[in-house]
Amino acid sequence: MAVPKKKTSNSKRDSRRAHWNRKANLAAQRALSTGKSILTGRAKGFEYPTKDDDEDDDE
């Protein structure tokens, strides 16, 4: 069975964890920003169904 020969240093561990946290924070920030732009009506990059569109589909 494959086993690491040496223990990973604390600084390397902390660096990897910090990088992962940075990526997670960036993704969360982007999601929050997209949600805010949708709620304020400023989103122009994509379309999503509204009540007016639903009524047109029924007819």
Curated annotation (Swiss-Prot):
<protein>
    <recommendedName>
        <fullName>Large ribosomal subunit protein bL32</fullName>
    </recommendedName>
</protein>
<dbReference type="Pfam" id="PF01783">
    <property type="entry name" value="Ribosomal_L32p"/>
</dbReference>
<dbReference type="GO" id="GO:0003735">
    <property type="term" value="F:structural constituent of ribosome"/>
</dbReference>
<dbReference type="GO" id="GO:0006412">
    <property type="term" value="P:translation"/>
</dbReference>
<dbReference type="GO" id="GO:0015934">
    <property type="term" value="C:large ribosomal subunit"/>
</dbReference>
<comment type="similarity">
    <text>Belongs to the bacterial ribosomal protein bL32 family.</text>
</comment>
<feature type="region of interest" description="Disordered">
    <location>
        <begin position="1"/>
        <end position="59"/>
    </location>
</feature>
<dbReference type="InterPro" id="IPR002677">
    <property type="entry name" value="Ribosomal_bL32"/>
</dbReference>
<keyword id="KW-0689">Ribosomal protein</keyword>
<feature type="compositionally biased region" description="Basic residues">
    <location>
        <begin position="1"/>
        <end position="22"/>
    </location>
</feature>
<dbReference type="InterPro" id="IPR011332">
    <property type="entry name" value="Ribosomal_zn-bd"/>
</dbReference>
<keyword id="KW-0687">Ribonucleoprotein</keyword>
<dbReference type="InterPro" id="IPR044958">
    <property type="entry name" value="Ribosomal_bL32_plant/cyanobact"/>
</dbReference>
